[in-house]
């Protein structure tokens, strides 16, 4: 049966030549209750409603169309429901299975509690595993490099590199003891200028009380053994004249352990360890450790200069604040 279609209605022309942003909706035709529902022209299909009847057409083909169409719509809904049925029961199953979440570029110091606090808002966290890469982090690698490649320990505690001559000026007692472990001299030098008490004083006194070992004769047996703590024959030594600008050494009390010195070169000692020249420290070391108790009238300022009562500067210059035995 031919269906009457209304003429197509076009939207009104745009005003001022400006096209409208949105096209107006197509007008709906007036409903016709004569048994046929008109269809807009843009739809290319005919809709059938279950209440629609065609009594004027006795044909069996046309009479079965509404029934078939009515049955097709529920079948489509059932098919959609059937297709979606496996999806709904599968959601709880998928939620029950734990998901593995990989997170990269987390801070180096993050641990399990930190990650649980960060990602716990998205669901229950069963386990947290932190995997470090093979290189390790930059901070950890640098720390390991510092710890493994240790430099040799500096022999001086405060990092100073002391010249033996300078060190002898500041701490001559330590340089006079040959059995003293010289690489650790800086430890004793660090104590200079301080009043030693307790542990430091005990260490200092231990080094100070150790006598030097016997010297080794080198140039001449009688000449180099003059400072050994045992009687040495002095008959073979001749007096040595001094230059006019050099003052003679003060007279010391005579004793078998410390015979009178007639030549300045007789005070040289060669030590066994060879850490420094004996010509520099020999006389002073022997004076410090071989001086008897009877020589209390003369005192030293720990710089190698000996002041006696007959010194013209004795009344003006007193003993300086030193680090020798007398001031301990």
Swiss-Prot record:
Gene Ontology cellular component annotations, sorted alphabetically: cytoplasm; nucleus
Q: Which InterPro entries match?
A: Fox-1_C_dom, Nucleotide-bd_a/b_plait_sf, RBD_domain_sf, RBFOX1-3, RBFOX1-like, RRM_dom
Q: Where is this site: Interaction with RNA?
A: 100, 108-109, 133, 138, 145
* Modified sites of kind Asymmetric dimethylarginine: 192, 288
- Name the predominant localization: nucleus
Offer one example of a GO biological process linked to this entry: nervous system development
A Pfam family that the UniProt record links to this protein: Fox-1_C
* TM region positions: none
Residue list for modification Omega-N-methylarginine: 192
Show the ranges annotated as biased composition (Polar residues). Answer: 49-87
Residues in domain RRM? Answer: 99-172
Cell compartment(s), UniProt: Nucleus; Cytoplasm
Q: Which PROSITE patterns match?
A: RRM
- What are the Pro residues biased-composition ranges? 1-30
Which controlled-vocabulary keywords does the entry list?
Cytoplasm, Methylation, mRNA processing, mRNA splicing, Nucleus, RNA-binding
Task: Please give the residue ranges the record annotates as the region Disordered.
Answer: 1-106
Gene Ontology terms, MF aspect = mRNA binding
Quote the function comment for this protein: Pre-mRNA alternative splicing regulator. Regulates alternative splicing of RBFOX2 to enhance the production of mRNA species that are targeted for nonsense-mediated decay (NMD).
Q: What is this protein called?
A: RNA binding protein fox-1 homolog 3
State the organism named in the record.
Answer: Bos taurus (Bovine)
